[in-house]
């Protein structure tokens, strides 16, 4: 089984690309969705114990938790120590299920793949990319953040040019879905020929 790491900066089209991998029959592990699931249940008691008042009705109140840890590196580290082992267990279950289903390829959808050293745990890296203009246009069209917040997020992420340089495959999402589907088909044909690389 080959493990593909899928990453890309905000607004590049990573979520759409992940959906198209799933549409092609590839099991996809969504790291963000897995964290949200943990916040909905399993992780809530430990988070409440560490950060009192950040949960309600057995679920993590994400805005409250974010406000509590955002400017406190020690608190962020403490939160990671709670969540990461649970995340690791959910990822292992995903791998076991994929192995049982004889999946030749799986995708790990990890927004901060390079920032967290995740590229060492995969056989090949797929970076989703588009022009900076289209990236801004997409994010600002969502209406969930302004230019200043977008700039702050982009500043924290590995630059797109560096991600592309470190990628085994680059998916360009500038021209609609059909070209992306074609790029995915090419990647799936190529990755099974590649040697296993993960540590």
Swiss-Prot record:
This enzyme's EC code(s): 2.7.1.24
User: Which domain of life does the UniProt lineage start with?
Assistant: Bacteria
Pfam families, sorted: CoaE
Q: Does the keyword Transferase apply?
A: yes
InterPro entries named in the record: Depp_CoAkinase (IPR001977), P-loop_NTPase (IPR027417)
Q: A GO term (biological process) for this protein? A: coenzyme A biosynthetic process
Q: In this entry, which stretches build a coiled coil? A: none
Q: What would be one Gene Ontology cellular-component term for the protein?
A: cytoplasm
* Cystine bridges: none
Q: Which reaction does it catalyse?
A: 3'-dephospho-CoA + ATP = ADP + CoA + H(+)
Query: Pathway membership of this protein?
Result: Cofactor biosynthesis; coenzyme A biosynthesis; CoA from (R)-pantothenate: step 5/5
Q: Which UniProt keywords apply?
A: ATP-binding, Coenzyme A biosynthesis, Cytoplasm, Kinase, Nucleotide-binding, Transferase
Q: Does the keyword Nucleotide-binding apply?
A: yes
Q: What class of enzyme is it?
A: transferase
UniProt family annotation: Belongs to the CoaE family.
Instruction: Tell me the function of this protein.
Output: Catalyzes the phosphorylation of the 3'-hydroxyl group of dephosphocoenzyme A to form coenzyme A.
Write the protein's name.
Dephospho-CoA kinase
> From which lineage does this chain's organism come?
Bacteria, Pseudomonadati, Pseudomonadota, Alphaproteobacteria, Hyphomicrobiales
Gene name per UniProt = coaE
